[in-house]
Amino acid sequence: MQKVHRHGDKRSCGATTEAQGYSNVFVNNQPISVDRDPNSHGGGALNAQCRNVFVGNKLVVVVPNDSDADALCPIPGHCNPKSDSGSPDVYIGQ
């Protein structure tokens, strides 16, 4: 089972996720992260790899999921700033 990724959770590059795709579903009082949510460095859209859980017709992001490069690429770590942290007690099985 994998942790659910949320707004403000860390990315592997040190940025945080900016949950923008859906704002009415919360996990531990934080908006849930869904496919294509960017990070605080600009860009870095997440590529949700959860196959079975959707929010507003978008796949939910879990830890770790890959992402597009953010605005600081080609600096190491910024060309795939994966989801790196998540809820301490909400998990999704694949």
Please state what every model-predicted region is.
Residues 2-94:
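Intrinsically disordered, low-complexity proline/glycine-rich segments
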